[in-house]
């Protein structure tokens, strides 16, 4: 009985097996373009941030709430690109919620090329809605510069998520 069913419907079942993955292709190509940088730094650009004599463009990789990453907690991905004139001068760039106490606590480091760097920032569940995102840049000459931007400007989706979580306003 099963053999008869297979012989009768095998063509239709095989065509269906070929067509089902085609439904996922648009999302695949959109993600591939995002990770390649064809669609910009990320889904949502936060803008240009002046950090001392240098500047960088900051963007959220995905315009969504932070994702739970196991024991590490909730994480949010940011991308950045250094300005043309400062690419050779900047040694490291760090990102953190709240003002860093020192360079040792500067936050998560951006990795990648100066044209497209990425960082996974931990987002504590009790972060205040008026928190600031601090960017620390260290030069090859030892110079260190810091700047901040409101988290609400850098990631409105994170602020919305924090208010749903019960973060303090």
Language model region names:
Residues 31-75, 105-111:
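Transition segment at domain starts
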Residues 62-64, 111-114, 150-155:
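A short, sequence-level motif marking secondary-structure junctions
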Residues 1-6:
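N-terminal Lys/Arg-rich, disordered targeting/topogenic segments
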Residues 130-134:
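Short, conserved beta-strand segments of beta-strand-rich sandwich/propeller modules, principally
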Residues 8-29:
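Hydrophobic membrane-insertion alpha-helices, especially the h-region
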Residues 79-127:
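Structured, soluble extracytoplasmic/luminal domains of envelope-associated proteins
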Residues 139-146:
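Short acidic/polar inter-strand loop motif in beta-rich domains
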